[in-house]
């Protein structure tokens, strides 16, 4: 998605440890017009998947997930990272390691909002090692729902997440594919049909 790549080039910052900081438009300050376009793009890519719900993990995945749900006309569920006083029983859970924060969080989704007939699209802001998506896959397995794919805003192609998900048969659609962050520069992987 060229618009997203341009935004990354303009506002993204490469930090030590192969971290791409995009807090100017995605995971701190949010560009709502870009998020709307991201949601529309995911909806177009998965238009024939008969999606009934969109799932994400709080908090950076919420904006693109909500816009995807809006474009598809389906509800959005975000897996909570912290225990809630109002959601204290009847939960599906999984442990997820955060590459950027170097911590493990237990994510949870209420059984109340999940139906065994659901066809779920997973949305995440980044795909590096695939831990957030893997956690959502574990919850989907516990719930007995079908995952139709994973929509990723920014994929780090030089890390194993996408290949590991593909090996499990998960359809991955990434809007920006970063091939390298070497020397503080963001390089993108060209996709078929691009010059």
From Swiss-Prot:
Gene Ontology CC terms, in alphabetical order: cytoplasm
Family: Belongs to the purine/pyrimidine phosphoribosyltransferase family. Xpt subfamily.
GO molecular function: xanthine phosphoribosyltransferase activity
CDD domains: PRTases_typeI (cd06223)
Annotated 5-phospho-alpha-D-ribose 1-diphosphate binding sites: 128-132
GO BP: any one term: xanthine metabolic process
Protein role: Converts the preformed base xanthine, a product of nucleic acid breakdown, to xanthosine 5'-monophosphate (XMP), so it can be reused for RNA or DNA synthesis.
Record text on subunit structure and interactions: Homodimer.
Residues at which xanthine binds: 20, 27, 156
EC number(s) from the headed UniProt entry: 2.4.2.22
SUPFAM superfamilies: PRTase-like (SSF53271)
Annotated localization: Cytoplasm
Pathway: Purine metabolism; XMP biosynthesis via salvage pathway; XMP from xanthine: step 1/1
InterPro entries: PRibTrfase_dom (IPR000836), PRTase-like (IPR029057), Pur/Pyrimidine_PRTase (IPR050118), Xanthine_PRibTrfase (IPR010079)
Organism encoding this protein: Limosilactobacillus fermentum (strain NBRC 3956 / LMG 18251)
Coiled-coil region: none
Designated name of the protein: Xanthine phosphoribosyltransferase
């Amino acid at each position: 998605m060229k618009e997203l790549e341009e935004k990354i080039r303009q506002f993204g910052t490469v930090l030590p440890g192969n971290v791409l900081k995009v807090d100017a438009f995605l995971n701190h300050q949010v560009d709502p017009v870009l998020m709307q376009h991201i949601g529309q793009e995911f909806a177009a890519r998965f238009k024939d998947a008969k999606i009934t719900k969109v799932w994400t993990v709080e908090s950076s995945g919420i904006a693109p997930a909500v816009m995807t749900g809006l474009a598809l006309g389906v509800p959005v569920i975000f897996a909570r990272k912290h225990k809630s006083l109002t959601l204290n029983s009847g939960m599906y859970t999984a442990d997820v390691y955060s590459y950027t924060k170097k911590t493990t969080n237990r994510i949870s989704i209420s059984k109340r909002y999940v139906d065994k007939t659901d066809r779920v699209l997973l949305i995440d802001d980044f795909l590096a090692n695939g831990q957030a998506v893997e956690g959502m896959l574990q919850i989907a397995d516990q719930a007995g729902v079908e995952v139709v794919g994973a929509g990723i805003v920014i994929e780090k192609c030089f890390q194993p997440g996408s290949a590991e998900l593909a090996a499990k048969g998960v359809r991955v659609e990434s809007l920006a594919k970063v091939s390298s962050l070497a020397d503080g520069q963001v390089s993108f992987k060209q996709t078929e049909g691009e010059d």
